[in-house]
Amino acid sequence: KQAKQMFEQQSIEVKMHLSTFSGELIELAADLTTNDSDVVAVVGGDGSLSEVITGLMQAKSQCRVGLIPAGTGNSMANDLKLKDTEEAISRIVTGNYQLLDLAKVDMVAGLPGNENGELTRYSANLVTWGLGVDSTIKAEKMRWMGPMRYDVGILMAIMANNRRHATLTLDGHPIEDDFTLFLIQNS
């Protein structure tokens, strides 16, 4: 509501869409009708940003995306030096944008959360598999801890020492082994 009021004080039209479950922002963003001059401002954290980008990419939207940090970790906001809501809105209103590379991840059927078929996701921040996912799943069960839950989650995942047999293909070269973690970071 604070962000909406700040935009409206600048005479900027705002349409709000709220999510109620994980993955809903993908659907909401994919269903938006946008043009090149529109900005979709994401009020949330890294997960919300990734969902909105995925939905916009599915819709082949050419609009810009702004991030207003309101998540727990806010890794991307920290990388972009977005201190608070006011800073983020100021950059959006003045057109102060940073071009970012996106990672496109095509996941095969059978992965947790993707048992029924292939799935494509996009990320501007990071993509992780294995330990990173394990720690996030554990952290999500401890939301009451705030940002510290990520530290506790990673410690628990390290202690569990889960390794997975997989084939990673990089530049056409397959690497088959037991892995603890894959991580692609954009910062």
Walk through the language-model features, giving the residues of each.
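ATP/NTP phosphate-donor binding region
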Residues: 1-40, 50, 54-55, 87
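Catalytic core of DAGKc-family lipid kinases
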Residues: 10, 58-184
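Structural motif
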Residues: 17-19, 42-44, 66-68
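Short glycine/serine/threonine-rich phosphate/pyrophosphate-binding segments
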Residues: 25, 47-52, 75, 100
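Generic alpha-helix structural propensity
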Residues: 35, 44-47, 71
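Short, basic, helix/turn surface patches
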Residues: 41-48, 95-99
